[in-house]
Regions:
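Elongated alpha-helical scaffolds
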Residues: 66-90, 103-114
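N-terminal amphipathic alpha-helical segments
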Residues: 1-63, 91-98, 102, 107, ...
Length: 124
């Protein structure tokens, strides 16, 4: 039976906000795929703006806790993915990997949309 530690929702929110700040800083330094990276950051910021309206009662609800944790994981994945574009790689490697990156950006955008929907459903 897997044992999971459920973090305090306020702590999860703080992690999300701090990771979003890191994403913003990282986006400033990316050498490739600047627009896509920036767009991911903007989508995360938009969701974070909505999260700021959550009150303590909202945060205690189990569906919100789960949705917040899923969003935290997704935001971390976005940061991990964006960070790789800080490195300067040869044009050949970038072109070769570009198709894979396109799919990864689509996947992350899809995950962000799903997180936003789940959070929205949990809030309303």
């Amino acid at each position: 039976l897997p044992y999971t530690i459920t973090m305090d929702p306020t702590a999860v929110l703080n992690i999300i906000y701090k990771t979003a700040v890191l994403i913003k800083k990282t986006v400033e330094d990316v050498k490739a795929n600047q627009q896509q990276c920036k767009r991911l950051g903007e989508r995360i910021d938009a969701i974070n703006q909505c999260l700021k309206s959550l009150n303590d009662r909202d945060l205690k609800r189990s569906e919100i806790k789960q949705s917040l944790d899923n969003f935290r994981k997704c935001v971390q994945e976005c940061l991990d993915f964006i960070t790789q574009f800080k490195e300067k790689t040869s044009w050949f490697v970038r072109v070769f990997k570009n198709q894979n990156h396109k799919e990864q950006f689509q996947e992350l955008n899809l995950q962000l949309s799903q997180c936003a929907n789940d959070l929205n459903l949990g809030i309303n």
